[in-house]
């Protein structure tokens, strides 16, 4: 049997394997060094040398996701060359591949543009800049957690401020990248730890200790996988998940290899037939589930007719449900495997010591506030505002990385509401469930030679219960075993007592090993997951549900109003339901935020719309009870702070109110408490002297209601909320480095 890929990405189907070399990062280092002549330096090279070097670098670029002789769509959109398809494009590709190969040769160093100039002719200077900038700002080079990157990270942010909601892989990747771009960043995380759905549980004590993955576990394919790069930077060994995966029937007997092979062959043939059927059905296939089509074809072609074969067939169905974190009755027959062409090649690996080592390295040094579940996200042309409990956080932009399950539950209120197109995509996509029972035992009773083994179940409805076991003893530091629960069984798992679940899984293990004379002891410690009822996830990972398609992943990735951005595994059409997909989405959004910030900076003189969080009614209500009223001047401030530097508003009424109440002109401006006190302390009692101080001495400019809403909408929102008695405190993204000025993003 082929081993499943991971609890996040088991193979979408069981394929016949093609023999190929495993991708070895260290071997690739040696190859690059050999081809490039060691450290970068100018040296005489023959035409044959250059051709061989170019070919080698093209293969390296191919291994990390670049086409050998074409541009990526992102490169075309970025305008890296003036004309497509000509000599300039070919030259650009050679330069691009060279830069990629140089950095992949040593991912622990920050590759400088000047280093590229040492090995590329000055005739291609414009291509060096185009390729280097594209690769740098799109997260293809100089990304990750290398300690040697520190000198190249700006100490103070100058590009703007960003709030990142969620400290999972997507949020951490984006935050680190944004800091390297020069942004001020603040990460808000609802849990007490980083990682999100990547969670390494430390089990046991002094004598028996193990690190077990309760969430995402396997690095699925090293080719082009950024998590493999992080492991290299941290010098963490990777353990290849071995292919051997024996299956045991419900009586604990090893399944006959011939029968196993025959059923697997029939299963794969049916999946091939599904592809043929949906092509014939065209649009009608969008309305039918994969489970419905598979069962119809199984009966039609007489696959798995007897009870023993049916149990084997059900095991493969459970494995498919595991791969998609969803019941086959929910998966789209038309698009369930739409990401197959983008699967990363190479070995599937465990990370020695657990994935927490990657998570901790990514989180190190980031400004993260834990225990901050977000209630409301407000966004508009003036900036963004995040409400978490009794606190308000403000910034220029916000990146939301919460799981799709949280978005489906409407746990976060968006003001204004998300576009209907995006909300519809959220509703259409599926978000399924995978649960686990993690057990630490006194010894490795299952043997050292296995990383996985499977178990058949008696009934189809229960096919996903403890159907697969992962052995972590090779990488966890102790004799740990994890049982997986998929499909309908994963849903029932949520409401079953842990003691009952443990009894069932031990019964299954003792049924396998007892007849062999192997004693299965009680575990030292057991943990049962509950991802479906976790209010910070409401499930495990996404899939394409009936009525949905890969386009919905793209819609989820769309930004809103150049202020609100989205990342996470459910926002990547090519790599959904994977750890590396989440990480790559964070890099993608960091790049997008940088481009938008540059665009906004270059268009500051263009008129902007009013900050969406407040309106004229809010403004008028505030001045019904001003903090200070002096003649025609009224002042309002945030009651939660007495800081002289804190900002408020002043309203000046120009009217003939006594004669005609409708004849009133009201103008506004923003000022500090300190400035208001100067006006208040004037000896003269006339309105004219105070107005002169306001405009001439202090140099403040009066404006109409619409203009002050445009300019100070975020400030007005903060003051209004505080004056309503909501007792919220105000924090600006990157507060340690930012002035406490709510208008810093204007």
Swiss-Prot record:
Which parts of the sequence are annotated with region: Disordered?
1-26
Give the protein's biological function. Probable histone demethylase that reduces the levels of histone H3 'Lys-4' methylation in chromatin of the floral repressor FLOWERING LOCUS C (FLC) and the sporophytically silenced floral repressor FWA. Seems to act in partial redundancy with FLOWERING LOCUS D (FLD) to repress FLC expression. Required for cytosine methylation of FWA. Controls primary seed dormancy by regulating DOG1 and abscisic acid signaling-related genes.
Q: Where is the signal peptide?
A: none
Domain SWIRM: where?
Answer: 51-152
Name of the top EC class for this enzyme: oxidoreductase
Protein encoded by which gene: LDL2
Cofactors, names only: FAD
What is the protein's name according to its record? Lysine-specific histone demethylase 1 homolog 2
């Amino acid at each position: 049997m082929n081993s499943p890929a991971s609890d996040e990405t088991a193979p979408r189907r069981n394929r016949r394997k093609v023999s190929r070399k495993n991708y070895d990062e260290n071997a690739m280092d040696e190859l690059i060094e050999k081809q490039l002549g060691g450290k970068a330096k100018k040296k005489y090279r023959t035409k044959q040398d250059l051709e061989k070097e170019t070919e080698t670098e093209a293969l390296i670029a191919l291994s990390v996701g670049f086409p050998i002789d074409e541009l990526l769509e992102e490169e075309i959109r970025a305008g890296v060359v003036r004309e497509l398809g000509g000599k300039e494009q070919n030259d650009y590709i050679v330069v691009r591949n060279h830069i990629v190969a140089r950095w992949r040769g040593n991912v622990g160093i920050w590759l400088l543009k000047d280093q590229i100039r040492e090995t590329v002719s000055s005739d291609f200077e414009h291509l060096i800049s185009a390729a280097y900038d594209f690769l740098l700002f799109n997260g293809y080079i100089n990304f990750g957690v290398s300690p040697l990157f520190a000198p190249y990270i700006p100490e103070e942010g100058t590009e703007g401020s960003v709030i990142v909601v969620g400290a999972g892989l997507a949020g951490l990747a984006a935050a680190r990248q944004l800091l390297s771009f020069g942004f001020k960043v603040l990460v808000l995380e609802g849990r007490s730890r980083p990682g999100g759905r990547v969670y390494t549980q430390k089990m046991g004590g002094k004598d028996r200790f193990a690190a077990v993955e309760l969430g995402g576990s396997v690095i699925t394919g090293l080719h082009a996988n950024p998590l493999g790069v992080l492991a290299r930077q941290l010098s963490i060994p990777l353990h290849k998940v071995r292919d051997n995966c024996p299956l045991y029937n419900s009586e604990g007997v090893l399944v006959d290899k011939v029968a196993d092979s025959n059923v697997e062959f029939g299963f794969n043939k049916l999946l091939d037939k599904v592809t043929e059927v949906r092509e014939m059905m065209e649009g009608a296939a969008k309305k039918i589930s994969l489970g419905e089509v598979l069962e119809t074809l199984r009966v039609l072609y007489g696959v798995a007719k007897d009870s023993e074969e049916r149990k084997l067939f059900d095991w493969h169905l459970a494995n498919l449900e595991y791969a998609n974190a969803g019941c086959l009755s929910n998966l789209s027959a038309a698009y369930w495997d739409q990401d197959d062409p983008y699967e990363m090649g190479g070995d599937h690996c465990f990370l020695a010591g657990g994935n927490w080592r990657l998570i901790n390295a990514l989180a190190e040094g980031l400004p993260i506030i834990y225990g901050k579940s977000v209630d409301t996200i407000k966004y508009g042309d003036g900036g963004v505002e995040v409400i978490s409990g009794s606190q308000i956080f403000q910034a220029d932009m916000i990146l939301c990385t919460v799981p799709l399950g949280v978005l489906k539950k409407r746990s976060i209120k968006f003001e204004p509401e998300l576009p209907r197109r995006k909300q519809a995509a959220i509703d259409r996509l599926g978000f399924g469930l995978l649960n686990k029972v993690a057990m630490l035992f006194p010894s490795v009773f299952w043997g050292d030679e296995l990383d996985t083994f499977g178990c058949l179940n008696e009934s189809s409805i229960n096919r996903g219960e403890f159907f697969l076991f992962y052995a972590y003893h090779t990488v966890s530091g102790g004799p740990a075993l994890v049982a997986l629960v998929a499909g309908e069984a994963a849903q029932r798992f949520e409401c079953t007592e842990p003691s009952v679940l443990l009894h069932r899984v031990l019964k299954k293990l003792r049924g396998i090993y007892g007849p062999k004379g192997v004693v299965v002891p009680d575990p030292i410690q057991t943990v049962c997951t509950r991802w479906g009822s976790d209010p910070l996830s409401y499930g495990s990972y996404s899939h394409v549900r009936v009525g949905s398609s890969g386009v919905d992943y793209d819609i989820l990735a769309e930004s809103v109003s150049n202020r609100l951005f989205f990342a996470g595994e459910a926002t990547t059409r090519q790599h959904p339901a994977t750890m590396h997909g989440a990480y790559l989405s964070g890099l993608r959004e960091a790049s997008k935020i940088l481009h938008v910030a540059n665009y906004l900076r270059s268009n500051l003189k263009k008129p902007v719309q009013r900050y969406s969080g407040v309106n004229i009614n809010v403004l008028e209500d505030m001045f019904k009870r001003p903090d200070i009223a002096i003649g025609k001047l009224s002042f309002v401030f945030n009651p939660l702070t007495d800081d002289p530097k804190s900002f408020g508003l002043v309203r000046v009424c120009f009217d003939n109110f006594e004669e005609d109440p409708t004849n009133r002109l009201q103008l506004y401006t923003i000022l500090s408490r300190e400035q208001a006190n100067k006006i208040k302390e004037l000896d003269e009692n006339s309105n004219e002297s105070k107005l002169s101080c306001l405009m001439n001495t202090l140099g403040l400019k009066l404006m109409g209601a619409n203009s002050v809403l445009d300019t100070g909408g975020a400030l007005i929102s903060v003051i209004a909320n505080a004056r309503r008695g909501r007792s919220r405190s105000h924090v600006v993204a990157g507060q340690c480095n930012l002035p406490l000025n709510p208008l810093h993003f204007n």
